[in-house]
Amino acid sequence: MTPTNQIHNALYLPFQREQWAELRESVPLTLSENDLADLRGINEKISLSEVTDIYLPLSRLLNLNVGAKQQRGLALNEFLGRVPPKRPYIISIAGSVAVGKSTTARILQALLSHWPEHPKVDLITTDGFLHPLAELKRRGLMQRKGFPESYDMKGLVDFISAIKAGEAAVSAPIYSHITYDRVPDQFQWIRQPDILIIEGLNVLQTGQDSAVDTKRPFVSDFVDFSIYVDAEEELLKKWYIERFLQFRTGAFSEESSYFHHYSQLTDHEATGIASKIWDSINGPNLTLNIQPTRERAHLILQKGQDHLMDQVLLRK
C-alpha cells in the first residue's frame, strides 16, 4: 500500500461510483439536458447520469450539513439571546487547472438552489483576486500566474471574512479570460446568500503553506465544507492541451483576446506551446502548491478518463 493510500484509508471513507450513487435516495433530478449544456465547461462531456450518480448524492450531503449548521446557529443564538446577521454556509472547490472545478461549482450551484432551505446560492471564483497584469509584470510574476504569490491574498481574505461576518453587500473583482486581466471598475456583489461557493486553485491553502506569514488567516479558515476535484496529472495535462486547442479556434480568435496571437497556430504548434505552458507553469504549481492541500478537503472527487468520476472519498 502506498503512503497516499494509507493516508486516504486513515482519513476517508471510499465510495466507488455505484456505492455513492445509492446515497442519492429520493433526491429529484432538477436539471434538464438544456440546463446541463449551459453548465458544461470547454472539453467536458458530463451527462445527466453523471449528475444523477455523483452530484445529487453530494447535494443531499451538503443540504444535510447546511441544515445542521443552521440548527447549531439557532441553538447558540437562543442561548445568547441575540439575533445575528445572516451568515452564509461557505463551500470551497479546489483542484488543478483543467480538472473541471468551474463545471463542478456551477452544477452544485444549480442543484443546491433548488432546495427550499437554501434557495439563494452564489458562486465566485478566486480569479478576480489575481493581481492585475501590470502588477504581475512589475513583480516579475507573469510566469507564476496561478501560484499563491500571484494573488491579492489580503483582498481575498478581507472579502471572505466580510461575507462570513454577515455584511449586507460585499464586492469581488471580476476577471476576464479574454483580456487575461481584471475588468476595470466592474465587481460582482454578494448580498447575504444562503450558500456561497468559492472556486479556485489555492482555496485549501493554510498558514503552514505560506513562506510569508504563517499566522494570518487564509480562505480555508472561513470554509464550512471543502471539495477537491482530483485526477492523474497525465490526464490533467491532456485535458489542458485539448482545452487550449479549443480556445485557439474560439476565445483566442477574438481581436481583444490577450492570446489572439495563438489563434493562427497549427495544431502541432499549439500542442507544443500548450505542453510547454503545462510543464513550466501549471504542472509545477500543481505539484508544489495545489496537490499538497488535497488531503485537507472534506470530500475528494476522483476523475478518470473523459472527466468521469470513478471514486468519491468522504472525510471520516
UniProtKB/Swiss-Prot annotation:
Pfam families reported for this sequence: PRK (PF00485)
EC identifiers of the protein: 2.7.1.33
Disulfide-bonded cysteines: none
GO molecular function: ATP binding; pantothenate kinase activity
Cellular component GO terms, alphabetical: cytoplasm
Entry keyword annotation includes ATP-binding: yes
Catalytic activity entry: (R)-pantothenate + ATP = (R)-4'-phosphopantothenate + ADP + H(+)
Main location group: cytoplasm
Recorded metabolic or biological pathway in which this protein acts: Cofactor biosynthesis; coenzyme A biosynthesis; CoA from (R)-pantothenate: step 1/5
BP-aspect Gene Ontology terms: coenzyme A biosynthetic process
InterPro entries with a match to the protein in the record: P-loop_NTPase, PanK, PRK/URK
Residues noted as binding ATP in the record, renumbered to the chain: 95-102
Keywords tagged on the record: ATP-binding, Coenzyme A biosynthesis, Cytoplasm, Kinase, Nucleotide-binding, Transferase
Claim: Iron-sulfur is one of the keywords in the record: no
Annotated localization: Cytoplasm
Family as reported in the entry's similarity comment: Belongs to the prokaryotic pantothenate kinase family.
Full protein name: Pantothenate kinase
Source organism (scientific name): Shewanella piezotolerans (strain WP3 / JCM 13877)
